[in-house]
């Protein structure tokens, strides 16, 4: 991968390594590859919608492209990069641990992911693809898809789920057992806290998804009737089970980005800790906790009674409180800093701005009376893309910008990286901001054609997506150029406020051969 430590043993290092840095690098490469495939599919969607009329010629094909785009981006791009990549690389370093708690389990949890991805790609090529959307609702996924594509998608989700659960157990035990004795819970860095809460949510919610899709599998193949109303089942059970996983999942995607933004704001300001760091920890815990009890706000239109809708509306609005605490704490941390024009500052400010917009549209959608009108329109699509495409993905870009030199030992071109930010910022906003208006005017999701009245919004969105794709290519060029340019990372301006910066410059193959005792932290008594 890079010039910071020599690999011995060729290919077997990548296949068999139990070193957290090697496995983290594999996760990054896998996430990049999946992200490129997912982005290509999103471009296909935007080209189809660029003007009225048909490009793909089949609604089933269009829906299977949407399904593949969602599953690739969620399970094979954001999660491997955030938790597998940044988590594997930085968590042991931030805890003063020599490696992960179960190094070989770590290796297994990575190699389950390419298997899962090949299965979901196979599903796209069987019987006109799996056109169910990533939610895989019955009866569309049972009677509506009699072929093998949905079965392949279910096996893919099983593989990805097992991988995530194994990784989550590993991260939890590492945080609990391998923490340096001088780092108490309240002194752990916020990135470690976000990863810890994230993996807790994974362990809590993924078995529920596994149960739901296993029941779906038996409904399809073994003549059971869990979700078939004609024989006493209820498709709403599936929706409740799926969204009990699906809502914590969106917090699983965004929480590590919160941690990255917290670390970046420390880096930028040179402060010892984030403003209100204990409050930030409680906000992370609150988001994780409340995120588990609001799942049915995805289901306002299925005929829930008024009391249930009132509860889920209120509970969903409560999540805005800890999220607001985080946003204002980041701003308070950045307040008073010496403003130096650099890519990291741009990414952090961009994240805070875009995530806040996504959060505000979320507060609107949490109202059940409004959501009944806006449900399954492009307003919802714009909301979750502002939180994920412009939140989690900007978090990944921020993490790469922050830790690139730390991980590789090379320095990227700062002006080029700033150009990537400007292009990406313009592109994603041009893509998703106009679609809010299309959604308010009643433009529904998951249709491959539309009336001419919506064409202005769609043309703007399609141009924006092309700008974003160009920005992505420029980003990859910047990273490759940093290797080719071979500008060695010599020193940093960073004020030392974490165990990872006690290492000499960039990172070598094995860190913390003996336990460090981190003396600038208040000791536990």
Curated annotation (Swiss-Prot):
The entry marks the following residues as binding Cu cation, namely 247, 297-298
Q: What is its EC number?
A: 7.1.1.9
Question: What main location does UniProt list?
Answer: mitochondrion
**Keywords noted in UniProt:** Calcium, Copper, Electron transport, Heme, Iron, Magnesium, Membrane, Metal-binding, Mitochondrion, Mitochondrion inner membrane, Respiratory chain, Translocase, Transmembrane, Transmembrane helix, Transport
| Record text on cofactor binding | Binds 2 heme A groups non-covalently per subunit. Binds a copper B center.
User: What is the recorded membrane topology of this protein?
Assistant: Multi-pass membrane protein
- Give me the residues that bind Fe(II)-heme a, please: 69, 385
Q: Which reaction does it catalyse?
A: 4 Fe(II)-[cytochrome c] + O2 + 8 H(+)(in) = 4 Fe(III)-[cytochrome c] + 2 H2O + 4 H(+)(out)
Cofactor names: heme; Cu cation
Binding positions (heme a3): 383
Bridged cysteine pairs (disulfide): none
**Cellular component terms per the entry's GO annotation:** mitochondrial inner membrane; respiratory chain complex IV
Q: Where is this cross-link: 1'-histidyl-3'-tyrosine (His-Tyr)?
A: 247-251
**Transmembrane portions of the chain:** 25-45, 71-91, 108-128, 152-172, 190-210, 241-261, 274-294, 317-337, 344-364, 387-407, 420-440, 459-479
Please, one GO biological process term? electron transport coupled proton transport
What are the binding positions for Mg(2+) in this chain? 375-376
Q: What family is reported?
A: Belongs to the heme-copper respiratory oxidase family.
**Annotated function:** Component of the cytochrome c oxidase, the last enzyme in the mitochondrial electron transport chain which drives oxidative phosphorylation. The respiratory chain contains 3 multisubunit complexes succinate dehydrogenase (complex II, CII), ubiquinol-cytochrome c oxidoreductase (cytochrome b-c1 complex, complex III, CIII) and cytochrome c oxidase (complex IV, CIV), that cooperate to transfer electrons derived from NADH and succinate to molecular oxygen, creating an electrochemical gradient over the inner membrane that drives transmembrane transport and the ATP synthase.
The name this protein carries in UniProt is Cytochrome c oxidase subunit 1
Quick one: which gene encodes this? COI
